[in-house]
Amino acid sequence: MNDMSSDGKKVKSLSDLPGVGQSILNKLIEAGYSSLEAVAVASPQDLSVAAGIPLTTAQRIIKEAREALDIRFKTALEVKKERINTKKITTGSQALDGLLGGGIETRTMTELFGEFGSGKTQLCHQLSVNVQLPLEKGGLGGKAVYIDTEGTFRWERIEAMSKAIGLEPDSAMNNIYYMRAINSDHQMAIVDDLQELISKDPAIKLVIVDSVTSHFRAEFPGRENLAVRQQKLNKHLHQLVRLAEMYDLAVIITNQVMARPDMFYGDPTVAVGGHTLYHVPGIRVQLKKSRGNKRIARIVDAPHLPEGEVVFAITEEGVRDAEE
C-alpha cells in the first residue's frame, strides 16, 4: 500500500495530504468529508461544490487520497489473495455458515429478505452480538451499528443472545451503536454520518439496516413515484456498499417481500425494491418460515456461492442449528 505522499511524508489523515492546509481542511470537514476514504471516493465536481474549492484543487486532493489508500488497478491474483483473506462473522448456525461459505462476509453487502416472522431481525440481532466474538470463535472482535427503521430492535434479545455465548450483556450492548431512523431522508443522513463515526471508532465491523426499504415504500407509493423512489434507494444502497469496501466491514440489509399475482407456479413472493435491489447486494438470501422454530435459508444470488438451502432454528438463546 502506497501510504506516502509525494513529499515522502506518511499519510494517515486528510491533514497529511500535500497542499491541504487548515483552511481547506476546515472546508472539507464542514462539507462532510472528514476522512481519506470519504475524499477518495468523491467526484471532483461534488467535492469542489460542497467544499467551495477550485475544481483543480479537488482533483489533486482526490488523487492524493486515492494513492494513500492504494485505490488502483489490481491484478486478478491480488484480488484472489484479498478474497481468500476475507473475514467472516458466524451466524450461530454451522449449517447457515456453510451455505454462506463460512459466514457473513466483510467488504460485501448481504441482503436478507423474507416475509414477516421469517427470522430477518432475529438474525440481525444475533450478528450484532456475534461480531464481538474473537476471531477464533467466529467473530471479528468488533462493534456493530444497528439502524432500525421499523422499531423492531429489542435489547432483551441482545441480552439473552450475549449471555448464551459467554459475553457480558451490558458490555455487549455497549458495543452496539443504535439509531432509529424516522424517515428515508433521516436513514440516508445516518449512513452519511457513519463515515465520521467509523473513522473515530475503527472497531466498527458490522452495519445493519433493518429494514432498508420500509420508509421508501411508505413515502413513495404508486407507479408515479417509482422513479424517484428507485433513484433514492439506489443512492442509499451504494452509500452502504462504499462503507463496506472502504472500511473492510460487513453490511447487512433486510427487505420485505410482496405477492406477485401473475405468478402461477413456484414462489409467488418477490423481494421489494425491484431491479435496484436485485443488482446491488453482493449476496442475496431468502428466509422462509418452517415448522415451529425452524427457518429455511436459500441463496438466491451470489457470484461465488452455489445455490442451495439449509434449515436453521431460532431458539431462546439465538440462532442455532436445527435439531433433527
Curated annotation (Swiss-Prot):
Signal peptide (from-to): none
Function: Involved in DNA repair and in homologous recombination. Binds and assemble on single-stranded DNA to form a nucleoprotein filament. Hydrolyzes ATP in a ssDNA-dependent manner and promotes DNA strand exchange between homologous DNA molecules.
Pfam families, alphabetized: HHH_5, Rad51
GO MF entries: ATP binding; ATP hydrolysis activity; ATP-dependent DNA damage sensor activity; damaged DNA binding
Annotated residues for binding of ATP: 114-121
Protein name: DNA repair and recombination protein RadA
Family per similarity comment: Belongs to the eukaryotic RecA-like protein family.
Protease keyword on record: no
Gene3D superfamilies the UniProt entry points to: 5' to 3' exonuclease, C-terminal subdomain, P-loop containing nucleotide triphosphate hydrolases
Biological process terms in GO annotation: DNA recombination; DNA repair
Xref: InterPro entries: AAA+_ATPase, DNA_recomb/repair_Rad51_C, DNA_recomb/repair_RadA, DNA_recomb/repair_RecA-like, DNA_repair_Rad51/TF_NusA_a-hlx, P-loop_NTPase, RecA_ATP-bd, RecA_monomer-monomer_interface
PANTHER family with a match to the protein in the record: MEIOTIC RECOMBINATION PROTEIN DMC1_LIM15 HOMOLOG, RECA/RAD51/RADA DNA STRAND-PAIRING FAMILY MEMBER
Cited NCBIfam families: PRK04301.1, recomb_radA
Keywords: ATP-binding, DNA damage, DNA recombination, DNA-binding, Nucleotide-binding
The keyword DNA-binding is annotated on this UniProt entry: yes
Cross-referenced PROSITE patterns: RECA_2, RECA_3
